[in-house]
From Swiss-Prot:
GO terms for cellular component: cytosol. This is Alanine racemase. Substrate binds at residues 134, 314. One of its GO terms (molecular function) is alanine racemase activity. Its EC number is 5.1.1.1. GO terms for biological process: D-alanine biosynthetic process. It comes from Nitratidesulfovibrio vulgaris (strain ATCC 29579 / DSM 644 / CCUG 34227 / NCIMB 8303 / VKM B-1760 / Hildenborough). The modification N6-(pyridoxal phosphate)lysine is found at residue 36. PROSITE patterns: ALANINE_RACEMASE (PS00395). The gene is alr. InterPro entries: Ala_racemase, Ala_racemase/Decarboxylase_C, Ala_racemase_C, Ala_racemase_N, Ala_racemase_pyridoxalP-BS, PLP-binding_barrel. Catalyzes the interconversion of L-alanine and D-alanine. May also act on other amino acids. Pathway: Amino-acid biosynthesis; D-alanine biosynthesis; D-alanine from L-alanine: step 1/1. Belongs to the alanine racemase family.
């Protein structure tokens, strides 16, 4: 549920997301933007509608319910629900909303078949496990699956999907290529029965750096939102030039001196070694600004980077503004993004947080949000 009780401000640049989509299209023939989990915190409906207007032929969401929400907002292109129809209610909703759910097992296939007819079959995407050991059929199930599908004219397989475990790590390329080979064998078996079925294997990293794994439809996710999935690797150049799409700011509650020798916040984990000035900002772990950033995080105040002092509290955090002249109550401080060269990226914040940019964006994006709609 979105956070509605604070004064944080999340601003999402749709123009940046579209620029990233255009960048991806220079290397991908048919990218299917992944906008699951509220578009990684960027706003499902706004992002989906902007991408459809830009020419996306389909988008991928997480759940059928998320897909129905997008459809209700007026999204007219195809929607693939990556978690599939989990129960009868989901199956009914997928059929009535024209959503393409993944199928993970025979029970799920039969659940969806009950909602279609030979004249109006429910379209499905067949999910295969090629190495994640997470969800879906295996390569050994292909023959029996095709045989069962031939007895169910009320469903129509239009796509087969699998997911890569380490496409972002070139030191494990052998595993990635083994997954690709397994998927190729799966597709050969499927196409001997369903010649028109499309294949979708590549995530952001593979979309950018492994064209041999593209198949018919590519599934960029984190790259759409400006994070380079290949950062820090020998393939990092393939993800350069992506634009961050989210900034998060909060107000200053109070500015006061912190004399040398005085501690601050819970646990007294920080004691000033010299006279300082601190600002208490309206952000804490209840606002999805992690307690893991205690004594580690940075923010942007007055165009300068400043450190977090002491422990992050539930709704407040202390920052050192000794070198930020004129800062006052009510001024905005950026936790993510920010004006000028001092901006904090999602990747950098994730490193300080001890996590990945996906989590940073999904969590901070739950705060009060607005969209910059200036898409060119």
């Amino acid at each position: 549920m979105p956070i509605s009780y604070n004064k944080a401000s999340v601003v999402v640049s749709l123009q940046s997301i579209i620029a990233n989509y255009r960048r991806i299209r220079t290397v991908a023939q048919r990218p299917m933007p992944v906008i699951k989990s509220d578009a990684y915190g960027h706003g499902l409906e706004a992002v989906g509608m902007a991408l459809e207007a830009e020419g996306a032929r389909e988008c991928a969401v997480g759940t059928v319910g998320e897909g129905a929400k997008l459809r209700k907002a007026g999204f007219g292109a195809d929607i693939v629900a990556l978690l599939g129809a989990l129960d009868r209610e989901d199956a009914q909703l997928a059929a009535s909303s024209g959503i393409i759910p993944t199928v993970l097992d025979i029970a799920g296939l039969e659940r969806l078949a009950a909602q279609g007819t030979p004249e109006r079959p429910v379209r499905v995407a067949l999910k295969f496990d090629t190495g994640m050991a997470r969800l879906g059929f295996t390569e050994h199930d292909v023959s029996a699956l095709c045989e069962r599908l031939r007895t169910l004219p009320s469903v129509r397989p239009v796509m087969a999907v699998s997911h890569l475990a380490v496409a972002d790590d070139p030191t494990q390329s052998a595993f990635t290529m083994a997954q690709g080979a397994a998927f190729a064998r799966i597709m050969a078996g499927l196409r001997s029965n369903f010649p028109d079925i499309m294949g979708s294997l590549s995530n952001s990293a593979a979309t950018l750096a492994h064209p041999q794994l593209h198949w018919d439809v590519q599934r960029p996710g984190i790259a759409l939102y400006g994070s380079n999935p290949l950062r820090g690797t020998a393939l990092a150049r393939h993800g350069e030039g992506l634009l961050p799409a989210m900034s998060v700011s909060v107000p200053v509650l109070q500015v006061h001196p912190l004399p040398a020798g005085r501690s601050i916040s819970y646990g007294r984990t920080y004691t000033a070694t010299k006279d300082a000035t601190v600002a208490i900002i309206a952000a804490g772990y209840a606002d999805n600004y992690s307690r893991a950033l205690s004594g580690r995080g940075v923010a942007v105040a007055g165009g300068r980077r400043v450190p977090v002092l002491g422990r992050v509290c539930m709704q407040t955090t202390a920052i050192d503004v000794t070198d930020v002249p004129g800062i006052a109550t009510g001024d905005r401080v950026w936790l993510l993004g920010g004006p000028g060269p001092a901006t904090v990226s999602a990747d950098e914040l994730a490193d300080l947080w001890g996590t990945i940019s996906y989590e940073v964006l999904c969590l901070l994006g739950m705060n009060p949000r607005r969209h910059d709609d200036s898409v060119e």
